[in-house]
Amino acid sequence: GGKFGGGGYSVSGGLHGVGVSVVNALSEWLEVEVHWNDGKVYFQRYERGRAVEPVKVIGKTNKTGTKTTFKPDPQIFETTEFEWETLAHRLRELAFLNSGLRITLTDVKADKKAEYKYDGGLVAFVAHLNKNKNELHKEIISINKQVGDVGVEVAIQYNDSYVESVFAFAND
């Protein structure tokens, strides 16, 4: 999980790696600020896919996390309207799948902001999915098992709905 020697998150979905590379290539500008566990804050700015300057230390921190800010390139896109609900849905899922991870979605144009953080992992996700349903049992059945490098997490709660909802997530 994670880059920089592991020990990070166990599920990712295009937030780093090729995902940010593609966003960078399609942006007029992109800025990345990383609060790293060495106590430093690193920063780098890109314009149209190219680094403007080398990575630099811009401060000290006692937090960890990454902030990525970008502006889609109007030379590539005719319109740059984002579907808030689509982004919110996926980022909420990622926050559930990465228990304790805080994800903030900000739309500067619409002056809109949402924050997602769930400490309960899949159990919290199942509770969220069933919040407006009649559960057949109150306690969510859950299994969380790690064998070597392989981790499996399962959460189940039956309800009286006629339609079943089965979600499966896998990482590398």
Language-model features: locations:
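GHKL/Bergerat-fold ATPase module in large chromosome/replication-associated machines
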Residues: 105-172
